[in-house]
């Protein structure tokens, strides 16, 4: 079993893996209209992945971290930097990357797509397909309050 993580605002913590955000807005690995949930293999990576999308002058005050336990038998496909197009890290992401996640979700051949993080390529993000039959085997843990350390926002260390 592996535990993966997602940081969300509290109102979204009741259904954190429903894929609603990517469905509405898309992401690096999915187009709008594709329902997948983005998680990270480490809490620290989830922190970085969320942090790059917030306004440092007005960070959300209602963040929570959600952990999900994925049994070893849940099907997954693993892609590495070597198996991706050479331009997989830039911002904005090329549309060819969203096509990868769109195909993964539509084909429903596996429940998980493991991909390298564009921010930390040696670590992985996990796309979960909430429409795959094995999704029911994923155990979502209760959300816990989460706050970034003030130093992320330029606050000086005390003392």
PLM regions and their residue ranges:
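Active-site and NAD+-binding cores of ADP-ribose-processing enzymes
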Residues: 2-18, 31, 59-159
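Generic secondary-structure signature for well-ordered alpha-helical cores
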Residues: 12, 52-55
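Short, flexible, solvent-exposed loop/turn segments with mixed acidic/basic and small polar residues
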Residues: 24-29, 57-58
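Extended catalytic/binding region for NAD+/ADP-ribose chemistry, centered on the ART fold
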Residues: 28-53, 127-131
């Amino acid at each position: 079993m592996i535990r993966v993580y997602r940081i969300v605002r509290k109102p979204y913590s009741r259904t954190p893996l429903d894929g609603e955000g990517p469905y509405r807005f898309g992401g690096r690995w999915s187009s709008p209209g594709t329902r997948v949930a983005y998680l990270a293999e480490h809490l620290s990576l989830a922190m970085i992945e969320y942090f790059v999308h917030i306004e440092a002058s007005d960070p959300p005050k209602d963040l929570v971290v959600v952990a999900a336990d994925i049994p070893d038998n849940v099907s997954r496909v693993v892609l590495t930097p070597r198996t991706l197009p050479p331009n997989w890290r830039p911002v904005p992401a090329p549309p060819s990357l969203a096509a990868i996640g769109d195909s993964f979700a539509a084909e429903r051949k596996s429940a998980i797509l493991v991909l390298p993080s564009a921010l930390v390529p040696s670590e992985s993000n996990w796309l979960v397909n909430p429409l795959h039959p094995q999704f029911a085997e994923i155990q979502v843990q209760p959300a816990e309050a989460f706050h970034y350390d003030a130093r992320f926002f330029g606050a000086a260390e005390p003392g």
